[in-house]
Structure formats: C-alpha cells, structure tokens
Amino acid sequence: MGQANVKESYEEFKSYGYADDILPKTSENRDWGTFNYVTVWMGAVHNLMSYMTVAGFFVLGLSVPQVLWAVMIAALIVSAGYVLNGYAGQKYGIGYSMLLRSSFGVKGSIIPAICRGLIAGVVFFGTKTIIGAQSFNVIFEKIFPGYMNMVPGFDFLGLDFPTMLSYVILWVITVGLFLGGMKILSLFSKWSSPIIYIFIVGAAIWAISVAGGFGPIFAYAPAKPMENWLVFIACVSALVSNWGGPIVNIADLTQRAKHPKAPMIGLPLGMITSYILFGITCVGLLVGTQIAFGIKDFNVVAAIDQIGNPVAVIVLLLALNIGSTSYVVFGNLLPSGLQMTALLPKMFTVKSAAILTALLGTVILPWKLVNGTAALYMFYSFIGSMYGPITGIMLVSFFIERKRKLDLSSIYVKPGENGEYKNGVNMVACGVLIVSFLITLSGSFLPNVPLLANISKSAFLSGMIISSVLYALSYKWNKSSAITQRETTAKVS
C-alpha cells in the first residue's frame, strides 16, 4: 500500500520534455491530507444538475424510499470507483493522462484522453454552466426587477439576452477561479462546503416544515409508479454517470496524497456522508415543495423560489452554484487541461487548455442539451457510454494484468519512442473501448431492441461491466496463447 519513490526518475523524465504538471509527484509535491479528500466533493454534491437528476427520479415513478436507496447505492459505487481507480495515482504520483498510457499505450491513450478531456469535459462544462446561468436569472431578477425583460425579442441561437448575460458572468467566474491555481482551488473547496451545507440544510428544514413534517414526505406517492426495477438501476447509473468523470480521472487528485490512507479514507468518507445528506435534503426540498405548492416537474429552482424571502432565495441559489462551480473546476476544467497538456505539451499549458474547454463548451450550444428530463438522461447515456468502458479497462489493466505494479519508464518515454506496445497502441484495449462504447450507446438509437435499450439506460454500469469482462477475457486468452506458444517452441527445440 506504500508510495513509490519517484524522485530519482523525476529529473530524467523532465529532461525528455514533459511539463511539470504531468510529471510524477515527488514527496515534496504531495500536499493533500485526509481532510482535503473528505472536503473536495462535499460542496460539489449539492449542485443544480444533481438536484435536476433526482427530480427526474420522481417523474419516472420512484417513491421517496426508493430515491434514498438509489442515492446511497450510487454513493457506494462512486466511492469504490474513487478508491480503486485512484490507487495507482497515490502509489506512483501520476495523473490520469499518464496512467492511461499503461492501459492503452503511449499513442493509444489519445483516444480515451480525448473522450474524457475534450468531448465529455466540454459537454459537462457547457451543460452545468447553462443550468447555473438559469438560476442566475432568478437571482438577478430578485436584485434587479425587470432583469428578465431586458432586450425583448433578442434570440441568439435559441438563447435570450438575460440568460446569455448570466451565462457569460458565470463563465468568467468559473474560469477565473480555475486560473487562480491549485492553492486557491483547495481553499475554495475547503471553505465553501460549510457555507453550502448551512443554507441547503436550512432550505430542506423549511420545505419539510411547510409540507407538514417527515410523515407526509415519506408517505408521498408518485402519480405513476415505477414500471420495473430496471428503472431503479437506470436511476442509480445516472447518478454514477454524474460522477463518472471524476471516477475516471481521480488519479489527478490522488497523486497529491501525503500518505496512502489519505484518499482511501477521505474520499469514501466525504462522498458517502455528503451523499446521504444530499439525499435527505434533496428529497425534503423537492417533495416538500411539491406537496405544499404543487411545483411542476419537481423544478428545483422553482422550489427554492417558493421560499418567499428574496435574500434567502438568492443566498441558497448562490450556495448551489458554489457547489456546481466546484464540480466544474475540479471535475472538468482541471482534467481537461491536464489531458490536453499531455497530448500537446508544446501547444497547451493546463490553463490555456482549460480555457479552450470552456470556449468549446459554449460553442456546442449547451442550452439545447438540457431542455427537459429526456434530454438530460440522453446526456447521461452518452457520457456513461464513454466513462464506464474507460473505467473498466483501467481497473482490469492495473489490478489483474499488471498486478498493481507499473513501470514508469514505459510511460514516460523519450520523444519518438512507443513504450511497451507496438506502435505505441494497445490494440486490445482500444478495440474493447470502441466495442463497449458502441454496444452501450446503441440502445439510444435502437429503442425498439429491449436488451440494448436497457443497457443504454444504465450506460455507465453496463459499459464498465462489458469492458471489464471483454478486456479480462482478452488478457486471459492472450496469456494462454503466449504460454502455449512458448511450450510449442520448447518442444520443437
């Protein structure tokens, strides 16, 4: 469980031209303790997109106990993903972009790096920012009455002027926070969490009170009950997909661990306790306001707006946006910047790559991706189809194929060298990734094929299982073939 000594190799790898951001962390640069890992996601779990996701569960027919079970099961799965996929990072001090090379090859790692850093990172940044911008509309309308009536008739690719202005403001805040550096981010994560919890818990208590207490909330029954347990599994998978990005690139955080137990204790402790509280506050706020005010489609922003006190509404929405911003910075801009730096070190720094991600996140017109529950779950299916297979391959590669041991010299290679795989590509891993992605996503386009449709609805979990099984079988088959070939050669000799 110890940490490898990479100090001797550091200068050698640095001489090859690798940027400081992607070199293995030496003991001097490992500055995160258990408390940092406990708090890193504590505020981020309370973000508007997560509340929208859980609101969708009630629309799909889940009862209050079923929603709470879905949240708790998702927390356990995400925590396990953090610990397992973060193990190599804390042991060797390397981040996601370089860890990928051990599984996919020096050049083959480009495929999953682009999936996580560019495609998914861009989409996630855009969607979370536009959701935050919509809540900013409510905030600004409270502060500046008539804000939503500015420039009537304005339409920019489907975006009205007030929302566009709110989007730009939140975009600048998010990117500016990231450009402040890791120390600023660490302080932000550490001190924003208590603020978020104070106001979220307060709002939940208010909602439970106006609904008449816990009794009516737990007795609440959806208008249309859940069709079958596959819907429940799909809901769990949607929540896991929401955290699929951090699961994939958790090594970017665990590489900074002062000691091995810091992330192994801190990440599960922070995620599980935070998610249990998230489940309670989310259910209390959504169901409480539904009972008291009949909020349509469990709209969380509309629910908060029912508080009546303008100051309370503003502060609570700001608190939720702090959580969303924390997630976007740590879960999207940071990994996207690191991946692009690893792919094109002469063209990008972490900060310039993150700015590109933020710009592209706007170019994709994210406001068209979150215009309803169906669109949101299609989004989860898409990103889960990428995150799940990547996670499965990485876990099998490190724990089964490599037995938790890495050769950093085959990862940090000299310019022009390909490492341990022919032409720098692990064809088996890349092939399994593509096949798993196609199988997992195909149900979204073939809804009349029940098996594929159900696989797609649980994209992250399905993709991870499919890729794990396929890659493990491929490894066992290749290993058996190699042994047979050696035995045949020995007999001939």
Give a label for each model feature.
Residues 1-64, 76, 201, 225-236, ...:
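Membrane-interface "cap" regions at the ends of multi-pass membrane proteins
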Residues 34-51, 166-173, 207-211, 221-285, ...:
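Hydrophobic, membrane-embedded alpha-helices of multi-pass small-molecule transporters
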Residues 47-50, 73-81, 116-128, 195-209, ...:
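Selective recognition of specific alpha-helical transmembrane segments in multi-pass small-molecule
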Residues 71-104, 116-130, 285-289, 325, ...:
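Juxtamembrane transmembrane-helix boundary signature
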Residues 113-114, 140-179, 195-204, 231-250, ...:
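Transmembrane alpha-helical segments of multi-pass small-molecule transport proteins
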Residues 129, 133-142, 195-221, 239-243, ...:
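Hydrophobic alpha-helical segments and their helix-loop junctions in multi-pass secondary transporters
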Residues 130-133, 165-209, 267-271, 379-388, ...:
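Membrane-interface loop-to-helix entry segments
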Residues 390-473, 477, 484-488:
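C-terminal membrane-solvent junction of multi-pass transporters and transport-like membrane proteins
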